[in-house]
């Protein structure tokens, strides 16, 4: 038995329920790099489960915040949800579950520090949630999420977490114009197991901020931060006349 299988068994025990389809857990803990390095072995990576888990997570947290804070506005709830389920928050939870040591991944990804990469850990948490939802249903999924994220939500409410610049930037610019913000990946560099993405945030046809990161989400957040800080420098972060800044 591999070290990853041993860790997965410990995780299974820690979760505290009997899996109806244990292959879902295996899939949730299989990174795409493992599949790419072992073609022909019938392995399935966790990206589809991540897609599902992302939606389940948003539903559970949205409902929880809606019930927990009946006096908060839609904008406030959106901001709280974004901070609760952002990449750093989910990576922190994944570390608490020791998901990094459970993951099956390719040698190249592992050598480059993939087991500790926030984007991989956050994606693994969402994939695990997707697997739990398919195997156990919504109620157990809700219990799992709220148990894992309760301290994160407390930190969000108390203002102890990093700011969500994407949400803040959108709120500022929409005060003066309904024009949407869009994000685009402008560049990718590095090998498949250690990519760096450069994102741009576009407003009224102009790139108003750029940022880089080891995941698309991180790059977009950095691009939003760049634009937001530029707005602050122009004295517009609390002003209703914000517009294109570059």
UniProtKB/Swiss-Prot annotation:
KW rRNA processing (keyword) present: yes
Sequence positions that bind Mg(2+): 50, 123, 126
Keyword entries, A-Z: Cytoplasm, Endonuclease, Hydrolase, Magnesium, Metal-binding, mRNA processing, Nuclease, RNA-binding, rRNA processing, rRNA-binding, tRNA processing
S-S pairs: none
Cofactors demanded by this protein: Mg(2+)
Compartments, record wording: Cytoplasm
Main subcellular location of this protein, as a coarse class: cytoplasm
Domain spans labelled RNase III: 8-137
One Pfam family it belongs to: dsrm
Residues covered by the DRBM domain: 164-233
Catalytic activity from the UniProt record: Endonucleolytic cleavage to 5'-phosphomonoester
GO terms assigned for molecular function: double-stranded RNA binding; metal ion binding; ribonuclease III activity; rRNA binding
Top-level EC class: hydrolase
Keyword Membrane attributed: no
Active-site feature positions: 54, 126
Membrane-spanning intervals of the chain: none
GO cellular component: cytoplasm
EC number per UniProt: 3.1.26.3
Function per UniProt: Digests double-stranded RNA. Involved in the processing of primary rRNA transcript to yield the immediate precursors to the large and small rRNAs (23S and 16S). Processes some mRNAs, and tRNAs when they are encoded in the rRNA operon. Processes pre-crRNA and tracrRNA of type II CRISPR loci if present in the organism.
Subunit structure: Homodimer.
Similarity comment: family membership: Belongs to the ribonuclease III family.
Name of this chain's protein: Ribonuclease 3
Lineage of the organism: Bacteria, Bacillati, Bacillota, Clostridia, Eubacteriales
